[in-house]
UniProtKB/Swiss-Prot annotation:
The gene is CARMIL2. This is Capping protein, Arp2/3 and myosin-I linker protein 2. Residues 1087-1114 are annotated as: Necessary for localization at the cell membrane. GO terms for cellular component: actin cytoskeleton; cell leading edge; cytoplasm; extrinsic component of cytoplasmic side of plasma membrane; intermediate filament cytoskeleton; lamellipodium; macropinosome; membrane. The keyword Membrane applies. Cell membrane-cytoskeleton-associated protein that plays a role in the regulation of actin polymerization at the barbed end of actin filaments. Prevents F-actin heterodimeric capping protein (CP) activity at the leading edges of migrating cells, and hence generates uncapped barbed ends and enhances actin polymerization. Plays a role in cell protrusion formations; involved in cell polarity, lamellipodial assembly, membrane ruffling and macropinosome formations. Involved as well in cell migration and invadopodia formation during wound healing.
Length: 1435
């Protein structure tokens, strides 16, 4: 048994490795418990974050004890005998003895290094206690890597800490966190840890990630916004705040925190003296007074003051606000530190009950506040109860001198009430840049005193950039004082003044007209929603006179009733936009409901010289406004931003704007109109998506920077001069060299010691090289502020402008000389000279037409060049570090090879049983580190990549399956008799994995491939497969109807819808009788019937409902109304319907039906579905046309083609009708028309026909209907009636038949299956079959005395055929009628002869039989024994 220097055999080492797999063993030490001696063998296996004490006397191995390094509270080392004592959380004391001091020191170094990775600021003195010898402790300190030489892991070792905590708590390691940290935070240099990035994880995983921040030195901010924190996460946040000294910012907004959390947070901060917290935001959490009192107490005593404090919308009361104000006023550190204070959204916190000792006491002191937000706190903005500013300030000074700032004296709170502007004018007027006092009261008393505090503050302000007074209901005097103070201040520039919703009205408009021109400090003015109305005319004129206003918001002020006044206002705004001297650049008329009035502004954009931003959202201008906007964008080149949401714009309007942006290259920003897009998406989603994508593509094109510059910018990110895989390679190589050094040991001889020293130097140089990369990046990315370079570039731009002007002048002069020489008489007038001077005047601003970013682009190019230089230098440094590490590792490998000749056998048997082979240095390295060897081979084989995109350190799959597991086939796939596809790929080859111990899989036999040219076929391809059958449970109470087997003649032997016919053939309610003619014996014995189509829509949806035809016929309408069968006569609209082409199954039946009477009434009317009704032309009166209306023409793809009437045919029919003189009836028809007006539309048939009972004659103009068929009983002739115009109708029928034959339509001359209908009236007798000319066909079955078909019991062989089966037929075998309608009719309807007249004046006699020639088999009608679904037996 081969023994290693540490006394552990190779077999035992392999057994331990397999026992602890997949965990990686880093160090094995032989040990024993005190008193047992060396006879009792134990091995201490040290992993990365955990130690295992294994009992190795007998196999299998047994774990006697295991503990995490984070459980170690203290360690005590002893040299004689060499032993260590652990103080653990789970065990009070664990003593282990080792064979030598070297093993003891290795254990101490490994545990100390692991603990230091988790706790970077820990020291060896805290970990090792007495009786640890000082000499041993000194050796351990010298051997432990320092922070400068220790390779830096991503984000300050966050992942290592997180992994250690997962091992300590027994939780799985989440790779999502590892990926985010490696890919996002580290590569982008982000020090802001957001819990929202991991909100999809469980609360325990989230709590572990927060706990890993407790001792992290990289992250500076922890934020959680709009996310409810669980109790575990809250506890870890409190623990982190009590331990972390590097976290500077804590943002917990809208996290459902309560006052108890704030109290505990204050306690945690109070107990941590070295806390680095400087920014705190608890906005959106309901904090009670106790929580605010505890936080205020901490803020009052903390040595390090906060820079930012946000307590917006926290439910602060006046008591909590007073406590906070006193804390800020008491701690003098806040005067020079606090710059951002947000207390907005706390109504009543600064109300009338607030005294002078609260927040105003801090604001009145000199401080450095730059951001103050007190919106919605009910604070008084100016003087209350007439108190003067000077007296209030004097009293406050006396009070502060007498009480030292701890509280106001008696009576001060009543005599000196608080004022906001009075306080800030004394305290922070020189440093305040943002003041938001919106939604507050200006004054609580009606005082006529001038608001001196407001005017005083505005005259003293120096750096103010934003003043928000929205919703404060400013009186005219306050507005006048406001503008006067701004007029007196000569220090302010670019101030944004928000006066929206202040109810200024006419008085405020007059003040603004008088003083806005003098307020030169205001560059942006928001006057929205102030009810100006008609005063907008003069107000716009006053705004146009201002020379400082660049942005004006006038929305929600156009509530003008007079249209002329509104037009006047809009035209004044247009003049303001087109004025060359007006500096206005941005205009907002949002939420004004201008509708078509916005078109005036949009037309003005075509000639706009200055406007760069426009907001026209909320004006309901529709698609017309969108089209005008599109036209303006085609010619406008000054606009940079357009906002146009909430305008009722459809997809067409969006598409117009998108197409206009194709020609606009200057628009940079157009926020997506979400409301309009959401509405348009519902109606036309495809067109909307196309328009949105086109808009975004055009904006991206307009904002695209130089591709070379963008490539450099993305490549050279912070901490990214060298790609992360290169840094990872350096770190891995450092680790590999360190492992070689540890493997070499101390007794390696002079050459080994030299190799170790070289390796240590290489590691130190590599770590130092990586540490200077951020310095190189800062040096390369620092902006160039060389004033000489800037002056030269600006001078160069001026020179370019002068050259352009000179070029234009030369071109103009040459053009004039040429024009004068060619046409001197045309240039004698003076008008052309004025026009030419106007054009040349535009060349004065030619330097402004040069690229606006030319100067910035020049500095950007310089920065990119500097980054390229530093990047090249960084790459060379890293390359040198890699070369040094590789050389050191090669030297160590040579030393290991020389040492192996002494400690290991010189030769090993060959794997194939041949002669033993000597080990080369590379083979020895592959023996110890097979994974690294394979990785190097893969790197050598793969092409080199200078800038890899993905880090090699990202292991998204933590577990590696062994080769045996990969090669083992699944039982289902390997079982014989199954359709198993051959497996290919690396998983099927069974290559052994080095990381997976176990016996290697044997080589698989080679597969015999077919010769070239022969296709690869699976061996089970020809195997017969069983027929798939789906057994459906029959419905309760339904008859068991066996499904009909498919016909072989139809070519449907393999159907894909087995079981569908069984489903459709079963009924929930028993049917006793059903109208069905008998089957034709000729059809049964002749051609093979085509399978029937699927019953759809009304035919199958209401299959459980008994049809009306099953009920007995009734002769009296009064006694039994509505159920008697009604005979439906063929109308003129049925004549004009195009007949269908017969199928194969119909030809034989049609040939047999040629022997019957050729009466037109006997022709079977084609049965159309609702969609196919688009081909029918119905003649209805004008009133019926208005009542019914026309449905849109919706057709299916299979219905287009030969069955469609051409427009020319319809025109010919109309000409025929005009020739024969069809007109409206009169006389007795009027009475019948009035009587039957209530029953104009009786009911809809199963195929969508609307039964019309009107007797009114149709107009001469023919209009196609999609779903209406006239069935007027008054139009139906009697048994023997013949009108005088029968010859005319006969001629029309012959012409129609000839027209149909010329178009190639199938002629149906034989008798169709007559459909039994209901009698139209109880007093009218139904015509007999003899009088109607109906043939006595045996296939139709017997008839009753009324000429109706008698009902027949339900056939047992009925079944439903799916649509898929019908589509499998060949096109030649599928009849045209199947293409038109798959709807199954409930019963055939009896066809009546067409009415000879359409009104009462045309007679009531039926047409005589029309003799026709027998048709050919191609034109034969369908057999009566076959229904319209393809020739199957009729039900």
């Amino acid at each position: 048994m081969a023994q290693t220097p540490d006394g552990i055999s190779c077999e035992l080492r392999g057994e331990i490795t397999r026992f602890l797999w997949p965990k990686e063993v880093e160090l094995l030490l032989k040990t024993w418990l005190p008193g047992e001696g060396a006879v009792q063998n134990h091995v201490l296996a040290l992993l990365r974050w955990r130690a295992y004490l294994l009992h190795t006397t007998c196999l299998p191995l047994r774990v006697d004890c295991t503990f995490s390094y984070l459980e170690v509270q203290a360690m005590a080392l002893q040299e004689t005998p060499p032993q260590v004592t652990f103080e653990l959380e789970s065990l009070r004391e664990l003593v282990l003895e080792f064979p030598g001091v070297a093993a003891l020191e290795q254990l101490a170094q490994h545990v100390a290094a692991a603990i230091k990775k988790v706790f970077p600021r820990s020291t060896l003195g805290k970990l090792f206690r007495r009786p640890t010898p000082a000499s041993m402790l000194a050796r351990l300190e010298r051997s432990s890597p320092s922070e400068s030489t220790d390779p830096c892991s991503p984000c300050g070792g966050f992942l290592e800490t997180y992994e250690a905590l997962c091992d300590y708590n027994g939780f799985p390691f989440r790779e999502e966190i590892q990926w985010d940290v490696d890919t996002i935070y580290h590569r982008q240099g982000c020090r802001h840890f957001s819990l929202g990035d991991f909100s999809h994880l469980g609360s325990r995983d989230l709590a572990l990630s927060v706990a890993a921040l407790s001792y992290n030195l990289w992250f500076r901010c922890l934020s959680c916004v709009d996310m409810k924190l669980s109790l575990e996460v809250s506890e870890q946040i409190l623990h982190m705040m009590s331990q972390s000294s590097h976290l500077e910012e804590l943002v917990l907004e809208t996290c459902s925190l309560r006052g108890d959390f704030v109290r505990r947070l204050a306690q945690a901060l109070a107990g941590h003296s070295s806390s680095g917290l400087r920014e705190l935001s608890l906005a959106g959490n309901l904090l009670d007074d106790r929580g605010m009192t505890a936080l205020s107490r901490h803020l009052e005593r903390c040595p390090g003051a906060l820079r930012r404090l946000s307590l917006a919308q926290t439910g602060l009361t006046p008591r909590g606000m007073r406590a906070l104000g006193r804390a800020l006023a008491t701690n003098a550190a806040f005067d020079s530190t606090l710059t951002h204070l947000d207390l907005s959204g706390n109504p009543g916190a600064l109300g009338a009950s607030e005294d002078s000792g609260g927040l105003y006491s801090f604001l009145s002191r000199p401080n450095v506040l730059s951001f103050l937000n007190l919106a919605g706190t009910d604070t008084a903005l100016d003087t209350v109860r007439g108190c003067s500013v000077g007296g209030w300030m004097t009293g406050r000074a006396d009070w502060r001198a007498g009480r030292g700032g701890l509280g106001p004296p008696a009576g001060v709170a009543n005599s000196l009430p608080p004022q906001l502007f009075a306080a800030v004018s004394r305290g922070c007027c020189t440093s305040l840049t943002h003041l938001d006092a919106s939604r507050n009261v200006f004054s609580r008393t009606k005082s006529r005193a001038a608001p001196a505090a407001l005017q005083l503050f505005l005259s003293r302000a120096r750096t103010l950039r934003h003043l928000g007074l929205a919703g404060c209901k400013l009186p005219p005097d306050a507005l006048r004082a406001l503008l006067d103070g701004l007029a007196l201040n000569t220090h302010l520039r670019d101030l944004h003044l928000d006066l929206s919703a202040c109810e200024l009205r006419s008085a405020g408009a007059q003040v603004i007209q008088d003083l806005v021109c003098d307020a030169g400090a205001v560059s942006s003015l928001d006057l929205a929603d102030n009810g100006f109305g008609s005063d907008m005319v003069t107000l716009v004129l006053a705004i146009g006179r201002s020379r400082s206003l660049r942005h004006v918001a006038l929305g929600r002020n156009f509530n003008v009733r007079c249209k002329e006044t509104l037009d006047d206002v809009l035209h004044r705004i247009v003049q303001l936009m087109q004025d060359d001297d007006c500096p206005l650049q941005s205009l907002s008329v949002a939420e004004s409901r201008l509708k078509l009035g916005a078109s005036v502004l949009l037309r003005a954009l075509a000639t706009n010289p200055n406007l760069t931003a426009l907001d026209i959202s909320g004006n309901a201008m529709g698609d017309a406004g969108a089209k005008l906007l599109a036209k303006a964008l085609r010619v406008n080149s000054r606009l940079r931003s357009v906002v146009w949401d909430r305008n009722h714009t459809s997809a067409l309007g969006l598409l117009d704007v998108a197409q206009a942006l194709e020609q606009n290259h200057s628009l940079k920003a157009m926020p997506l109109p979400l409301n309009d897009v959401a509405q348009a998406q519902r109606s036309r989603p495809e067109l909307t998506a196309r328009a949105v994508h086109q808009i975004q593509a055009c904006l991206l094109r307009n904002n695209r920077a130089d591709p070379a510059s963008s490539d450099h910018t993305t490549r050279l990110q912070p901490l990214g001069l060298v790609s992360d895989p290169s840094e990872q390679e350096v770190n891995e190589l450092c680790q590999s060299v360190q492992e070689h050094v540890e493997l070499l040991g101390c007794g390696a001889g002079p050459q080994g010691e030299a190799a170790v020293r070289q390796a240590e130097d290489a590691i130190q140089n590599a770590n130092f090289s990586l540490s200077i990369l951020p310095i190189l990046y800062e040096a390369g990315s620092s902006p160039s502020h060389h004033w000489q370079l800037g002056q030269k570039l600006e001078g160069l731009l001026r020179q370019v402008g002068e050259v352009c002007r000179q070029d234009i002048q030369d071109f103009t002069q040459a053009t004039l000389d040429t024009a004068r020489s060619l046409c001197p008489q045309m240039l004698q007038g003076s008008s052309w000279r004025e026009q030419l001077e106007g054009v040349l005047a535009g060349s004065r601003g030619l330097p402004e037409l040069l690229p606006e970013q030319l100067l910035q682009d020049a500095f950007t190019r310089l920065r990119d060049m500097r980054l390229s230089i530093t990047g090249t230098l960084a790459e060379s440094i890293v390359a040198q570090a890699l070369a040094g590490l590789s050389a050191a590792r090669d030297q160590l490998v040579e030393s290991l090879a020389q040492q192996a000749t002494v400690t290991m056998p010189p030769a090993l048997p060959a794997p194939d049983g041949g002669e033993p082979s000597l080990l080369e240095p590379g083979e020895l390295e592959g023996l110890f580190f097979p994974e690294e060897k394979e990785e190097e081979k893969e790197k050598d084989d793969s092409p080199p990549q200078k800038w890899p995109e993905l880090s090699h350190g990202l292991h998204l799959v933590p577990f590696i399956h062994s080769a045996a597991e990969e090669a083992e086939p699944e039982p289902e796939l390997a079982a014989p008799g199954e359709d198993a596809e051959p497996q290919a790929g690396p998983s099927a080859r069974g290559s052994p994995s080095p990381a997976a111990p176990g016996p290697p899989a044997g080589p698989l036999p080679r597969m015999d491939l077919p010769l070239a040219g022969q296709p690869l076929r699976h061996p089970t391809r020809a195997r017969p497969r069983p027929r798939r059958q789906h057994h459906h449970r029959p419905p309760p109470g339904g008859p068991q109807v066996p499904p009909a087997l498919p016909q072989e003649g139809n070519g449907l032997s393999a159907r894909v819808d087995e079981g569908v016919e069984e489903f459709f053939s079963k009924r929930l309610i028993q049917q006793d009788r059903l109208w069905a003619p008998e089957e034709d014996p000729a059809t049964e014995g002749g051609a093979t019937p085509v399978p029937r189509t699927l019953r759809k829509k009304l035919g199958t949806l209401f299959a459980f409902k008994k049809p009306r035809s099953t009920r007995g016929p009734r002769t009296d309408l009064e006694t039994s109304p509505g159920a008697a069968p009604r005979t439906r006569k063929t109308t003129f609209g049925d004549l004009l319907r195009p007949p269908t082409r017969p199928s194969r199954g119909e030809e034989l039946g049609g040939a047999e039906g040629d022997t019957s009477s050729p009466d037109p009434a006997g022709r079977s009317r084609p049965r159309y579905t609702r969609d196919s009704k688009a081909y029918s032309m119905i003649l209805l009166p004008a009133e019926e046309e208005a009542t019914l209306g026309a449905r849109p023409d919706k057709r299916r793809p299979l219905e287009r083609g030969e069955t469609e009437l051409a427009p020319s045919f319809e025109q010919r029919v109309q000409v025929m009708l005009q020739r024969i003189g069809v007109s409206r009836g009169s006389g007795g028809a009027e009475g019948k028309r009035k009587q039957s007006k209530d029953g104009e539309i009786k009911k809809a048939g199963s195929d969508g026909d609307i039964m019309d009972s009107s007797t009114e004659a149709p107009p001469i103009s023919i209009k196609s209907r999609t779903h209406s068929v006239s069935a007027d009983p008054s139009c139906r002739p009697g048994p023997g009636s013949q009108g005088p115009e029968s010859a005319t109708w006969k001629t029309l029928g012959q012409q129609l038949n000839a027209e149909l034959r010329s178009r190639g339509w199938g002629q149906q001359d034989g008798p169709g299956p007559p459909s039994p209908g209901q009698s139209p009236s109880p007093c009218r007798t139904s015509p007999s079959p003899d009088s109607l000319g109906l043939p006595e066909d045996p296939c139709l079955g017997p008839r009753n005395e009324d000429g109706q078909l008698r009902p027949r019991p339900l056939s047992a062989g009925r079944r439903a055929v799916s649509v898929h089966e019908d589509q499998l037929q060949a096109p030649a075998e599928r009849p045209l009628r199947l293409q038109r309608s798959p709807v199954l009719k409930r019963r055939p309807k009896l066809e009546a002869p067409p009415s000879p007249s359409l009104g009462s004046g045309l007679g009531t006699e039926p047409l005589p039989p029309q003799p026709t020639e027998p048709s050919s088999p191609e034109r034969s009608p369908p057999s009566p024994a076959t229904d319209q679904r393809g020739g199957g037996p009729n039900p």
